From Swiss-Prot:
<dbReference type="InterPro" id="IPR036188">
    <property type="entry name" value="FAD/NAD-bd_sf"/>
</dbReference>
<dbReference type="GO" id="GO:0050660">
    <property type="term" value="F:flavin adenine dinucleotide binding"/>
</dbReference>
<keyword id="KW-0949">S-adenosyl-L-methionine</keyword>
<comment type="similarity">
    <text>In the C-terminal section; belongs to the DAO family.</text>
</comment>
<keyword id="KW-0963">Cytoplasm</keyword>
<keyword id="KW-0511">Multifunctional enzyme</keyword>
<dbReference type="InterPro" id="IPR023032">
    <property type="entry name" value="tRNA_MAMT_biosynth_bifunc_MnmC"/>
</dbReference>
<comment type="function">
    <text>Catalyzes the last two steps in the biosynthesis of 5-methylaminomethyl-2-thiouridine (mnm(5)s(2)U) at the wobble position (U34) in tRNA. Catalyzes the FAD-dependent demodification of cmnm(5)s(2)U34 to nm(5)s(2)U34, followed by the transfer of a methyl group from S-adenosyl-L-methionine to nm(5)s(2)U34, to form mnm(5)s(2)U34.</text>
</comment>
<dbReference type="InterPro" id="IPR029063">
    <property type="entry name" value="SAM-dependent_MTases_sf"/>
</dbReference>
<keyword id="KW-0274">FAD</keyword>
<keyword id="KW-0489">Methyltransferase</keyword>
<dbReference type="GO" id="GO:0004808">
    <property type="term" value="F:tRNA (5-methylaminomethyl-2-thiouridylate)(34)-methyltransferase activity"/>
</dbReference>
<dbReference type="InterPro" id="IPR006076">
    <property type="entry name" value="FAD-dep_OxRdtase"/>
</dbReference>
<dbReference type="GO" id="GO:0016645">
    <property type="term" value="F:oxidoreductase activity, acting on the CH-NH group of donors"/>
</dbReference>
<dbReference type="GO" id="GO:0005737">
    <property type="term" value="C:cytoplasm"/>
</dbReference>
<dbReference type="GO" id="GO:0002098">
    <property type="term" value="P:tRNA wobble uridine modification"/>
</dbReference>
<feature type="region of interest" description="FAD-dependent cmnm(5)s(2)U34 oxidoreductase">
    <location>
        <begin position="273"/>
        <end position="680"/>
    </location>
</feature>
Length: 680
């Protein structure tokens, strides 16, 4: 693993603590897993006609049930989404320690390869959902860590793909109270069942717990039962209670409409405008779901906009409060990191090269204000050490392999990635999975909505109709009438390319302070970047080149290696990133601003205005979506934002909570005011 376990801060719990929190279900793993596999095969057989089977599991245990679900899924025409809820977060190092010390995998060697694949994704001990994708999307595992009721209640019910079946592990069975049962029911199909392990043994459910599950409309059965019933309808009263819960959720978040679901019968029903990281990853996430796309790129090849830099830092944005922004970026960073690993480690000939190095990112302060901010971030939360940990000046020097003589915050799983190669690799993988048509040198000048769908218009051609159109066109996001009111701003960024020489060439990690500096790649370091709002041109700027150098001198004054930074070649690249005021990307339905203003004029002076905006879906352009505003951290945020939009378009469970989805809503700037009864 990248996060080195030999550092004291990396080891927080020993094996006795772990085995107490994540107990094995049975002493005889081989015998138990044989029975478990038979049960799981019955579950898959009972739902064999579903293209996506969504299953829930309460408790991680020692992880063998999870691995067994994965192994048992053999239907090539079915995808599996397994949602595992575990109150005690665990990281990859601890999971490996648990398996090694218990020798549980040694008893079932057929799971060893899957276990190694799982560890390779580096699960981390963060609160919230971590989405792990395997086998080109055939198996997806959502790890929901933290208080189970909070995790369940934060999720949106998926009408098209609800949870069909639950497995409850013994160590959690009697700790699940009535509110948890109802939240499980809210997310479930009306005919979903619950299976328990050891129902008739001392380790099984109490009669009270069984009654509570049944009171929520679940049929509860031991996993050794010979039959999996798929259609035990709850009585009308219990069914009504479930529907009430779902309506309450829908009403509370009515202002944030979800995407209309794609028709699987329309092979070219979605168009993506843009040729960068966002569009390529959206195409990949849709391809994993069997959905074809058409991509329209104005340039001769991908990655010529903000995705065109040689190197970009990939690490999470943390806040002292660990609020929705911070939690989103942790989830997104980890998802993106896993994407890089999956794309570069696939078996030949499906492997796609991406220049990258997860060498860590070392964040340091550059003045008194930034030091106070960094100290506040470090001290305000008990951050998982695989996310970040504090280092003193000596440790920082060792990590950087050059002297910086400053303490800092080290992100051990972070590093740098080549953005345009990342975009190209995502598209290549998408094209391996399904039909993805790429239109290069095709600049869309206008989009037009007719009754039959959307049309894309160039100087010479008219494409369409498309049921869905996604604007993922970076700096040109606001070029169309339907998107020109988006509250988002362009910022110019000039990245300097400097030769790797002398002490500078020894840099071993990404430095982030006032600007950033990467280790060398193909003989050059990247140093940047300028930050100029609403630029008038994208030409090379000598002043910004010197400003980039000055930022390094301000960040690490009097260090000898600074003299090795040679700017004389005037080698640089200029791009534009689109930035929102709250630093969240934009992902979701395109707002109909004209209609918002019209509705506002009718409701702004009424006492009921706040209630109106709270309970009324915000006006949107039907079939038009936004994926942009990735700012300076698109490498971290872009792939997960694309995955979530793909899940919405296909009517699948989304790996984000309701509050975070509202933060990503392109409508959010107006709605924040309207929901508070304030003037626009």
């Amino acid at each position: 693993m990248t996060a080195e376990p030999n550092k004291p801060c990396q080891i927080k719990r020993d094996y006795p603590q772990l085995i107490n929190l994540y107990p094995a279900t049975a002493h005889n793993d081989a015998h138990y897993l044989s029975k478990l596999s038979i049960y799981q095969q019955r579950v898959f057989e009972a739902h064999s006609q579903q293209k996506l089977l969504v299953l829930g599991q309460m408790g991680l245990g020692n992880g063998l049930e999870l691995l067994s679900w994965w192994r048992t899924q053999t239907n090539p025409n079915q995808r599996l989404l397994l949602k595992v809820f575990e109150p005690n977060p665990i990281n990859a190092y601890e999971l490996k320690l648990l398996w090694d010390q218990s020798a549980s995998l040694a008893k079932v060697p057929e799971l060893e390869l899957l276990a190694q694949c799982l560890l390779h994704t580096e699960p981390t001990a963060i609160i919230g959902c971590q989405r792990l994708i395997f086998d080109d999307g055939r198996t997806t595992i959502d790890l929901h860590f933290g208080d189970i009721q909070s995790q369940l209640s934060s999720l949106i019910h998926s009408p098209l793909h609800p949870v069909q079946h639950w497995l409850v592990l013994p160590h959690l069975q009697n700790g699940l109270h009535q509110q948890i049962h109802w939240q499980m029911a809210k997310l479930s199909d009306d005919s979903a069942t619950v299976a328990t392990i050891g129902l008739n043994e001392s380790s099984g459910l109490s009669e009270t717990t069984v009654n509570r599950f049944q009171a929520c409309g679940f049929e509860v059965r031991d996993f050794t039962c010979a039959e999996i019933q798929t259609n035990p309808q709850p009585d009308a009263i219990l069914l009504h209670e479930r529907h009430v819960l779902r309506r309450q959720d829908a009403k509370a978040y009515a202002f944030n409409p979800m995407a209309a679901i794609l028709s699987s019968d329309a092979p070219s029903s979605i168009a993506i405008i843009g040729g960068g990281l966002a569009s390529a990853h959206l195409a990949l996430s849709l391809a994993e779901r069997g959905q074809s796309t058409q991509i329209f790129c104005k340039d001769a090849k991908l990655g010529q906009g903000a995705s065109g830099n040689r190197q970009g830092a990939i690490y999470p944005l943390l806040t002292p409060e660990n609020d929705e922004l911070s939690r989103f970026f942790q989830q997104a960073f980890l998802f993106s990191r896993r994407r890089v690993q999956a794309l570069t480690s696939a078996p030949a000939p499906n492997q796609t090269p991406i220049s990258h190095n997860f060498c860590g990112v070392l964040q340091t302060a550059h003045d008194e204000r930034s030091q106070l901010r960094l100290d506040k971030i470090i001290q305000s939360q008990n951050w998982p050490s695989e996310i970040a940990y504090r280092v003193d000046a000596q440790q920082a020097n060792c990590l950087a392999n050059i002297n910086i003589d400053k303490s800092g915050f080290f992100y051990p799983l972070a590093g740098w990635v080549c953005p345009y190669e990342y975009a190209e690799a995502a598209l290549q993988k998408a094209q391996q999975l399904t039909a993805v048509k790429l239109h290069l040198e095709t600049e869309i000048l206008e989009i037009e909505h007719q009754s039959e769908g959307w049309y894309l218009i160039t100087a010479k051609h008219r494409f369409g109709p498309f049921a869905q159109v996604v604007l993922a066109n970076g700096a040109a996001l606001t070029q169309f009438d339907a998107s020109n009111k988006l509250q988002i701003s362009p910022f110019r960024g000039q990245v300097s390319h400097v030769p790797a020489q002398f002490q500078l060439s020894q840099l071993a990690t990404v430095l982030c302070a006032n600007g950033y500096l990467t280790p060398s790649h193909e003989g050059l370091h990247c140093l940047g970047a300028s930050y100029v709002k609403e630029p008038k041109h994208l030409d090379f700027c000598p002043q910004e080149q010197q400003e980039n150098l000055a930022k390094m001198h301000e960040s690490y004054p009097n260090q000898p290696w600074l003299e090795d930074i040679d700017m004389s070649g005037n080698n640089a690249r200029v791009g534009v990133r689109m930035v929102t005021r709250d630093h969240f990307p934009m992902m979701g339905c395109a707002p109909d601003v004209a209609q918002i203003i019209k509705d506002y004029a009718e409701h702004q002076l009424t006492k009921e205005s706040r209630h109106y905006w709270q309970t009324t879906p915000a006006p949107v352009h039907e079939g038009l979506y936004i994926l942009g505003g990735l700012g300076s951290r698109g490498l971290s945020s872009g792939p997960l934002a694309a995955e979530c939009l793909a899940a919405q378009l296909c009517g699948e469970p989304i790996p984000l909570d309701k509050a975070t989805l509202c933060k990503l809503n392109p409508n959010r700037m107006w709605l924040r005011k309207l929901l508070k009864g304030k003037a626009l």
